[in-house]
């Protein structure tokens, strides 16, 4: 394990020296689990997002791109089970990983949450897409966006951060054909990852 940690430290050090990524708020002591992308990191990240969008949205006739809000009505998170089940163990208790915030001021303020994933934004807009574009199954919704998780112990560089970006597709199919489409998507994603050198 020590060898793996040493390797990760070397990768982080190289990425910082070369201008890819820096610890967030570093000149003020940092904030665990937050990272700032430097000039080369931003360029790399934007190129990956552009290639992903081209492959999985622009070049397909069955995909609709959206950009859903980061803040959503708390009922969304209640209905999806995030309020009761999106947690990590903390001793004998459970710790909800969602960042809680307030919308509005003073006594009029109401609770809200920073989204912990992008999927729910696509699900709540499903009917809007149906009403606007009338797609037939199969079709998908795609989104690239920020997500936030109040990690108990952020670690492993970018792999367990408090703020991160996701590139996500929700693909809707007839129940009996899910396995066929799952295998097709799995193959497409593997091919794309190979194309970009992962």
Q: Model-found features: residue ranges?
A:
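TRNA-recognition modules of translation machinery and tRNA-sensing kinases, especially anticodon-binding
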Residues: 2-198
